[in-house]
């Protein structure tokens, strides 16, 4: 078979790929030399580098149909042709067989499809199947338990991924920089719509209960705009950015996040989150937060924006409405008829007519004409065991202070503070002595064991208690992000990359939380139904085990081998089908010109 003849060709690099161009030589009479002109794109080097297989454009194949019978590769400066067989492969390609780690990514694929994540990604990143690239990087973070992107090429070489073509660290950096705020917000809206739709399909019309909390992500990059020194929750002596998340309590699925400067206190961030949710059209939700986010301003903002809430109020603020309500109900909270058998705490609910300004105007005084009111439910709880533990703990601390004073030993900072709070100092001649002020001790213990939850939505004290207790899920989400996935450092040097990488890490955390939730629910079912085979491994070990389910790659496709025993049970525990041995056709990963999302 005669080797095709090619016109003069040149390779040009774009941000995403190397392209093949034809050109014509023209003569420059002034410089008295020829130069290249009339460039025309005719193909793409599919490897992403200067050397590799060339995919010819359709118009060039129409001009030179003989090229259809050959595979053309660029090696050095030469173009090497290899004849193809009837299946469109060379003999060497037909003989090539490769083993890929595939079970874990197969399971993750099924979980993404079953959840609202898959459709939300397609909505946010529709161009050029970019959602597959984003998803592949997220899988890398989940299975590698590391966000160091330089390790991705080695991982991808041996792993079945949604995007099977090579992605070099520089390409991944460009993907991060292309992820903009608009696409992230589109993802949030689509994700929430999908989650509500799934709840409706199973007859659940309740509002989404979203646990709210924040964490700090440390950074060595001092030049990033949002990196500031603040109260680091990991006690790292490093600048940080703060990351706030909303996590749906029942499914464990994170549906929103926002980053903010590392020196911004928690209580100031909720107002912006409430405004973001209102602007994005995220409705039918109840925010559940801890004491760090409660306050009059945040209650008013929720009411103005029609966002439901369940806030844990601070009990230690002297003269506050919270303390006033506790004092009013103190006797009722000793009545055994007020003790709930399920939560095992005493509980009382009070309805308060809350007055607020729906449309505040700066420097304008609020009046009765401009004010509105809303009925709020203040749920007051008392736990005797917590109160007794606090009492015993305080007595032990007081005893240590008295012992050190008697032995002439120095007090540490906390002990010195306690000395000033509950002891009376007596000076007589040159002698100094201390006595315990019982009134101060009683005042310090007065509000221990009490909790006050306020809501505009949840009128039942028991349901409010359970909804608050379920906010542990957001703590578990942060542990997944920072410990299990190794994302306690961002490892980026510019703000554009930080935006994109934070989103991909959030996506990886979301998928990992689905895995954890599925395994936890399966474990609960096993306790109820002894016929189900118990799975004792944690989520990381389950994915590691499934990652050893191999897939054979051959020319033009893939197939799974036989899967038996424990690994079949692991697929069952995750609620996904076991992959069968039917061949899976290889996708076409040839890239077109790079575009913005």
Task: Please tell me what each predicted stretch does.
Residues 288-297, 315-318, 496-499:
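Acidic, metal-coordinating catalytic cores used for nucleic-acid/nucleotide bond scission
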Residues 519-533:
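Short, glycine/acidic-rich hinge or "gate" loops at secondary-structure transitions
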Residues 1-211, 215-221, 244-256, 263, ...:
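Dynamic "connector" segments at or just before major functional cores
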Residues 29, 159-165, 182-183, 202-203, ...:
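Secondary-structure transition/capping motifs at alpha-helix termini
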Residues 258-280:
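Active-site beta-loop-alpha junctions of metal-dependent nucleic acid enzymes
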Residues 464-491:
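Short amphipathic alpha-helical "interface-anchor" segments enriched in bulky aromatics
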Residues 494-515:
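Basic, amphipathic alpha-helical segments enriched in Lys/Arg and hydrophobic/aromatic residues
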Residues 239, 259, 308-467, 537-597:
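An anionic, glycine-rich sequence signature occurring as long contiguous blocks
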């Amino acid at each position: 078979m005669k080797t095709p003849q090619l016109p003069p060709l040149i390779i040009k690099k774009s941000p995403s790929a190397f392209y093949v161009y034809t050109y014509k030589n023209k003569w420059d009479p002034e410089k008295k030399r020829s130069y290249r002109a009339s460039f025309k794109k005719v193909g793409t080097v599919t490897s992403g580098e200067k050397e590799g297989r060339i995919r010819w454009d359709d118009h060039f194949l129409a001009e030179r149909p003989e090229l259809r019978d050959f595979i053309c590769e660029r090696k050095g400066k030469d173009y090497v042709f290899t004849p193809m067989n009837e299946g469109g492969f060379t003999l060497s390609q037909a003989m090539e067989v490769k083993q890929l780690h595939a079970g874990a990514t197969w399971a993750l694929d099924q979980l993404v499809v079953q959840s609202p994540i898959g459709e939300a990604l397609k909505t946010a990143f529709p161009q050029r199947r970019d959602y597959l690239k984003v998803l592949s990087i997220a899988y890398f973070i989940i299975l590698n338990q590391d966000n160091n992107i330089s390790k991705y090429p080695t991982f991808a070489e041996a792993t079945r991924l949604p995007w099977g073509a090579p992605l070099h660290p520089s390409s991944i950096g460009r993907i991060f920089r292309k992820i903009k705020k608009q696409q992230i917000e589109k993802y949030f809206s689509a994700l929430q719509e999908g989650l509500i739709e799934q709840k409706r399909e199973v007859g659940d019309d309740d509002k989404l209960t979203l646990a709210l909390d924040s964490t700090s992500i440390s950074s060595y990059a001092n030049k990033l705009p949002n990196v500031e020194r603040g109260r680091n929750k990991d006690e790292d002596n490093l600048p940080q950015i703060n990351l706030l998340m909303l996590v749906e309590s029942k499914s464990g699925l994170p549906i929103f996040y926002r980053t903010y400067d590392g020196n911004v206190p928690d209580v100031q961030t909720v107002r912006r989150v409430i405004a973001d949710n209102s602007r994005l059209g995220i409705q039918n939700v109840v925010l559940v937060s801890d004491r760090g986010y409660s306050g009059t301003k945040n209650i008013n903002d929720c009411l103005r924006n029609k966002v439901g809430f369940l806030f844990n109020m601070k009990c230690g603020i002297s003269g506050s409405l919270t303390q006033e309500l506790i004092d009013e109900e103190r006797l009722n909270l000793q009545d055994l008829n007020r003790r709930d058998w399920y939560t095992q705490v005493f509980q009382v609910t009070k309805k308060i007519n809350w007055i607020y300004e729906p449309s505040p105007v700066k420097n304008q005084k609020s009046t009765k004409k401009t004010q509105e009111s809303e009925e709020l439910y203040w749920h007051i709880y008392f736990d005797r065991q917590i109160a007794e533990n606090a009492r015993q703990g305080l007595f032990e601390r007081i005893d240590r202070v008295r012992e050190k004073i008697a032995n002439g030993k120095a007090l540490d900072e906390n002990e010195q503070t306690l000395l000033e709070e509950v002891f009376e100092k007596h000076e007589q001649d040159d002698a100094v002595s201390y006595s315990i002020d019982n009134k101060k001790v009683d005042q310090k213990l007065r509000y221990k064991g009490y909790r006050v939850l306020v809501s505009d939505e949840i009128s039942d004290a028991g349901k409010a208690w359970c909804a608050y207790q379920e906010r542990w899920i957001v703590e578990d989400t942060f542990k997944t992000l920072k410990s299990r996935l190794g994302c306690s450092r961002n490892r980026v040097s510019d703000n554009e990359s930080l935006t994109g990488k934070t989103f991909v890490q959030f996506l990886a955390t979301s998928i990992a939380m689905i895995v954890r939730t599925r395994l936890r629910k399966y474990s609960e079912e096993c306790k109820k139904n002894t016929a189900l085979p118990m799975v004792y491994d944690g989520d990381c070990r389950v994915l590691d085990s499934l990652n050893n389910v191999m897939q054979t790659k051959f020319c033009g496709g893939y197939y799974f081998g036989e899967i038996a025993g424990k690994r079949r049970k692991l697929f069952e525990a995750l609620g996904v089908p076991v992959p069968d041995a039917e061949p899976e056709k290889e996708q076409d990963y040839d890239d077109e010109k790079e575009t913005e999302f």
